[in-house]
A protein has these predicted regions:
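Bacterial Sec-dependent N-terminal signal peptides
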Residues: 1-25
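Low-complexity, Ser/Thr/Pro/Gly-enriched N-terminal "stalk/linker" regions
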Residues: 24-93, 121, 125-126
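Intrinsically disordered or highly flexible coil/loop and linker segments, enriched in small
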Residues: 65-69, 111, 192, 290-293
Length: 303
């Protein structure tokens, strides 16, 4: 469990896309590093928790009531969202990406508070309102093709499993059923034949895990297609390009799915994802130069 917690928290911190004010007093520092436990960075489990809290506090600076949404000021005119039609999913993205950090923190401390608000109460309230037509957080059922909403709901499925006792279990059956129906409308809907298939997989695996009837043939088909993208030595072809998403998406989401759901639901696929990750170990250092520099391929350097 400790290894799983550490994997998810590291993934969460690396995935959160928040801007940081680079004032000296606002930069996270590792205090009292322990180089016996962590020879390279000195960061222990507690340091990673502190780093997560540091990032999440930045987000909660914008949250003053349970109704406030994780929607942050834009820095540049060309940044997403580009029009008002994209704002609802941008708000959902803010919820989902910050929950990547909040979920393992809540697993460790369900009573966590930030900016005078109980973090668990905030996220549960926002999750419930995803399927509430009267709420500004409402996300309607899918009516078209694949969209960013699929990705964010898949991300929520990961977090709800990671901190199920805090985020999912306290909901009423009616609330669970309503949220599940919204998620299924996207999870069982069309996708793109790339790492996007993981988000269908996470939605369907989570709801299957909770006892809901899901399209299992579609779930298994997406798993097979994801594994078919493997090209050896740790590399996946991401329909059809090779880039750092091979390490970020496939080699992160694959093992997380295997640990959370796969070993129980589809052990043969879980085993293959883990073997593919092991293949990556010897090749990963070649993504960097001798002085630690890396190629800037799109935005993937952020990850």
């Amino acid at each position: 469990m400790k290894a799983r917690f550490a994997l998810f928290l590291l993934f969460a911190i690396l995935s959160l896309k928040l801007s940081v004010v680079f004032a000296q007093e606002n930069i996270f520092t590792v205090r009292q590093p322990d180089y016996q436990k962590s020879p390279y960075t000195g960061m222990t489990r507690q340091h990673w928790i502190q780093a997560g809290e540091y990032l999440l506090k930045g987000a909660f600076n914008y949250i003053h009531t349970l109704d406030d949404q994780m929607y942050f000021p834009k820095q540049l005119d060309k940044t997403y969202p580009r029009n008002t039609g994209e704002i609802p999913v941008a708000k959902l993205e803010g919820l989902a990406r910050t929950l990547f950090v909040a979920a393992p923190l809540l697993k460790d401390n369900p009573e966590l508070e930030m900016n005078g608000i109980k973090v668990a109460d905030y996220y549960r309230y926002q999750l419930i309102n995803i399927s509430n037509p009267e709420s500004k957080s409402y996300i309607p059922h899918r009516t078209g093709g694949p969209s960013q909403t699929l990705l964010e709901l898949g991300s929520l499925a990961i977090s709800m499993k990671a901190a199920q006792e805090v985020l999912w279990n306290p909901l009423t059956k009616k609330q669970k059923d309503s949220l599940a129906a919204t998620m299924l409308s996207y999870g069982e809907g069309p996708t793109i034949g790339s790492n996007w298939m993981f988000f269908n997989v996470f939605i369907l695996s989570f709801l299957k895990d909770q006892g809901y009837a899901v399209n299992e043939s579609y779930l298994e088909s997406n798993l097979q297609k994801l594994l078919a993208r493997y090209r050896g030595e740790g590399w996946y072809n991401d329909a059809p390009a090779y880039d750092y998403y091979s390490a970020w998406a496939y080699q992160t989401y694959g093992p997380i799915w295997a640990e959370m759901f796969g070993k129980k639901q589809y052990p043969q696929y879980a085993r293959q994802f883990m073997e593919n990750q092991h293949d990556m170990v010897d090749n990963y250092p070649f993504l960097f130069s001798r002085d630690g520099r890396m190629n800037m391929w799109g935005r993937s350097i952020c990850f």
